[in-house]
């Protein structure tokens, strides 16, 4: 059973409208690299110039924010669900 990555609506144009993408990556960094290999351009939407997750992008593994875990080194395993959630500003 692979890891499922839930793709937010604004990024689905890069994943050919796929809402859920499967990966066999072992951590978040590898999962993002896997997404980039399959869907060029998605990584620049998720990572900043220093290679860290952009501050307005939230990534969760089984509903836990990776910023409170090991960031991109957060381990993932078969059956986990990764959610990418862009922050929304308003006013």
Each language-model region and where it sits:
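Ubiquitin-like/PB1-type beta-grasp interaction modules and other compact soluble beta-rich domains
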Residues: 1-90
